[in-house]
Curated annotation (Swiss-Prot):
Family of the protein in this entry: Belongs to the DapA family.
Cross-referenced Gene3D superfamilies: Aldolase class I (3.20.20.70)
Subunit structure, interactors included: Homodimer.
GO molecular function: 4-hydroxy-tetrahydrodipicolinate synthase activity
Thermal properties of activity per the entry: Optimum temperature is 37 degrees Celsius. The activity decreases slowly when temperatures are reduced from 37 degrees Celsius while the drop in activity is relatively more rapid when temperatures are raised above 37 degrees Celsius. In this case, the activity reduces to almost 30% at 52 degrees Celsius.
Gene source species: Pseudomonas aeruginosa (strain ATCC 15692 / DSM 22644 / CIP 104116 / JCM 14847 / LMG 12228 / 1C / PRS 101 / PAO1)
Keywords from the named record: Amino-acid biosynthesis, Cytoplasm, Diaminopimelate biosynthesis, Lyase, Lysine biosynthesis, Schiff base
pH dependence: Optimum pH is 8.0. At pH 9.0 or above, only 30% activity is observed.
Name of the coding gene: dapA
GO cellular component terms given for this protein: cytosol
Pfam entry (one): DHDPS
Coiled coil: none
Name this protein carries in UniProt: 4-hydroxy-tetrahydrodipicolinate synthase
EC number: 4.3.3.7
Length: 292
C-alpha cells in the first residue's frame, strides 16, 4: 500500500529554464534520507503544465532511476485529453513508475459522466495503479463523491488525492468508498484531520522543505496519535500558509533555493517569487526550523 508522506516534488530548472538533472538527483536523495514515503513526480508542483511530453517522460525516468525501488514513485499523467492521458500513463508505466496521479480534466469542464468515462477508459487502457486527483480550485472541475464512489469500483483505480481542503467532503468520500480504496489529502493545512478520519496519507507541498516533519506527522496521524500529529501540524502551519503566498510552486521553489537545494529557475508564465514575499516566507521557514 502506498501511504504516508508523499512529496509533490518540484522540477528544478536552471536560470535559463533548462532541466537541472543534478539538482533533481539531489532532491530525490534528500527525500530518501529524510523519511519521505513516496515521491510524486511531474504533478502540479512539478510544473507539468510547462514541460513538453519528452521532458515529462524524462523526469519520470530520472526519478525512478535515482530512487532505485527504495520508495514508490507516482507519476503525474493527467491531461484534459483522454487520449493524451492514456499515452502519458503508458509512458510512465514503461518508465518504471509504481503508480500514476491523474488530475480531473481542466478547462473543457466535462460532466460527472464525462469524468467517469475519462478515468474508466484510462484505467482499462493501462494496467498500472491509478490515483484520481480532485483539485477544483485549479481545474474548475469538481469530481463529486458519488463519481468517486463509482470509480472506486473500477480495476486499477486505487485511490484519490482530495485537494479541496473540505473535511466534510473528505469524510463523505471515505464513507462511500471501500476500505481498500485510498483517500489522500492534497491540502497540507487539513491533512492531519483527513488522516484522522481514515485517510492514508498526504501528497504534500510542505514536504519539499520539511520532509522529516511531514513524515513524522503522517505516521502519527495514521496510527491515531492525534495529539502528536496536531502538535507537529501546529508547528508547520506557518509554512503551510506561506508556501501559498503566491501561486504554487513559486514559493516552494524559492524556499528550496534559499535552502541551497535548487538553482533559481522557473518557467513562464510562472515567475520567481516577488521580493515583497521573501521575508514572510523566510520568517515562516525560520519559525518551523527549516532555515537557521
Amino acid at each position: 500500500m502506498i501511504a504516508g508522506s508523499m512529496v509533490a516534488l518540484v522540477t528544478p530548472f536552471d536560470a535559463q529554464g533548462r532541466l537541472d538533472w543534478d539538482s533533481l538527483a539531489k532532491l530525490v536523495d534528500f527525500h530518501l534520507q529524510e523519511g519521505t514515503n513516496a515521491i510524486v513526480a511531474v504533478g502540479t508542483t512539478g510544473e507539468s503544465a510547462t514541460l513538453d511530453v519528452e521532458e515529462h517522460i524524462q523526469v519520470i525516468r530520472r526519478v525512478v532511476d535515482q530512487v532505485k525501488g527504495r520508495i514508490p514513485v507516482i507519476a503525474g499523467t493527467g491531461a484534459n485529453s483522454t487520449r493524451e492521458a492514456v499515452a502519458l500513463t503508458e509512458a510512465a508505466k514503461s518508465g518504471g513508475a509504481d503508480a500514476c496521479l491523474l488530475v480531473t480534466p481542466y478547462y473543457n469542464k466535462p460532466t460527472q459522466e464525462g469524468m467517469y468515462q475519462h478515468f474508466r477508459h484510462i484505467a482499462e487502457a493501462v494496467a498500472i495503479p491509478q490515483i484520481l486527483y480532485n483539485v477544483p480550485g485549479r481545474t474548475s472541475c469538481d469530481m463529486l463523491p458519488e463519481t468517486v464512489e463509482r470509480l472506486s469500483k473500477v480495476p486499477n483505480i486505487i485511490g484519490i488525492k482530495e485537494a479541496t481542503g473540505d473535511l466534510q467532503r473528505a469524510k463523505e468520500v471515505i464513507e462511500r468508498v471501500g476500505k481498500d480504496f485510498l483517500v489522500y489529502s492534497g491540502d497540507d493545512a487539513t491533512a492531519v484531520e483527513l488522516m484522522l478520519l481514515g485517510g492514508k496519507g498526504n501528497i504534500s507541498v510542505t514536504a519539499n522543505v520539511a520532509p522529516r516533519a511531514m513524515s513524522d506527522l503522517c505516521a502519527a496521524a495514521m496510527r491515531g496519535d492525534a495529539a502528536a500529529a496536531r502538535a507537529i501540524n501546529d508547528r508547520l502551519m506557518p509554512l503551510h500558509k506561506a508556501l501559498f503566498i503566491e501561486s504554487n510552486p513559486i514559493p516552494v521553489k524559492w524556499a528550496l533555493h534559499e535552502m541551497g537545494l535548487i538553482p533559481e529557475g522557473i518557467r513562464l508564465p510562472l515567475t520567481w517569487l516577488s521580493p515583497r514575499c521573501h521575508e514572510p516566507l523566510r520568517q515562516a521557514m525560520r519559525q518551523t526550523g527549516v532555515l537557521a
